[in-house]
Amino acid sequence: MTLMYDAIVAGGSITGLLTAREIAKKGNSVLVLEEGFEVGSPEHCGGLVSKSALNDLGIEPSVKSFDSKIESAKVFSPNGNHFSIDSTSQQIIVVNRRELDKQAAMQAQENGAEIIV
């Protein structure tokens, strides 16, 4: 038996899943191939993002995926120089990447994408 898809996405990380979601939204058949034993595992990077970036991507962090909010930070260089960042206007948040990836997978599937792990 031969299966045909309009698109095959290699990798079930946030980028691959959002790509699959957008392709599927247009009515195309999409297959996502993830090498891990489940979407979101292992985590590949931290989850420090702006709320506006998530909004632009069509993601509203669920309670499970939202860890905390960053209002300010001090950044230190190896030579001791440092500067402060006020991020209250940017709404910088820390998300649980595993849960955020699972949320993106659910969005992709709701739009018709298939995911194989």
Locations of regions flagged by a protein language model:
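N-terminal Rossmann-fold NAD(P) dinucleotide-binding loop
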Residues: 16-17
